[in-house]
Amino acid sequence: CNAKLAFISNERLFKIFIQAADNNKNIKNIITFEKVNYKKKIKKVTYIEEIFKKKENTNKFSIDKKNNDDEACIIYTSGTSGKPKGVVLTHKSILANLEGSIDVFNKSPLKNERFISFLPLSHSYEHTAGQFLPVATSSQIFYAENLEKLFINIKEVNPTIISAVPRLYEAIYKKILNNIFKKNNLIQKLFKINLKLGKTKYEDKKNYRLSDKIIKFLLSLIFDKKIKKIFGSKLKFLISGGGALSYEINIFFESLGIKILQGYGLTET
């Protein structure tokens, strides 16, 4: 792609990248998001904070016009045999993906949402759902410090949309059930009734009677509200992608009044 500038997030990746970059004639400048130890003078390495401190006239900078078919990024596939393969995505392919994603919400357009991003941005799923989609809908992106602090960060920022992989939802599902199983028999029975009524509401609305609605409402005050707090106080829905979400997990959250939207696609598209 003949890139002349590279952005590197941390020192660990810098050490890997610089081994190849020192022998690459195209790369002239490297901007790092952490201070790194680089004493050679082969490349110009700049810590991003140093750029912000300079009071230069930003009008000097200009952006070249791009065509839809120009390369926008290269994402390396995971889970394939042999070495990872670099997939070149054009501006057109990313925009088409965004148009399709935004069209899903045509009845309730996304605007000024609050996303929390914690998946690797080197994956096409998070590239779209966690980065480009928020930007395209004038929304905010909050980046989690790390996976261990994810739920602390969720409480801090109260996202309206959370994008994750099935594995996370499976872990939450198991944790909720384990906590319920530690309760007395009455609580366990009430929770099962709550799930059953939620499932009926989701799958068979015709047989969802008025009495069911009343019981479900009362039980939701006991269970649903507490469970929803795991995801903050402003959650609208969850997004699942990067793998298949089992029906069991999906219906579990839907039964608790937590909407999960499922996405799918290939890195190559």
Positions of PLM-derived features:
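Structural core segment of the AMP-binding/adenylate-forming
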Residues: C1-E50
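Conserved AMP-binding/adenylation subdomain of ANL enzymes
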Residues: L95-R114, L121-D224, K234, K259
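Conserved AMP-binding A3 loop
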Residues: A72-L98
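Conserved A3 ("GATE") glycine/threonine-rich loop of ANL adenylate-forming enzymes
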Residues: R167, G242-I249, L261-T269
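Conserved pre-ATP/AMP-binding loop-to-beta segment of ANL
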Residues: T32, K53-Y76, K83, S108-R114
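Conserved AMP-binding
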Residues: F118-H123, G242-A244
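Adenylate-forming
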Residues: E11-N26, Y169-N185, L221-S233, Y247, ...
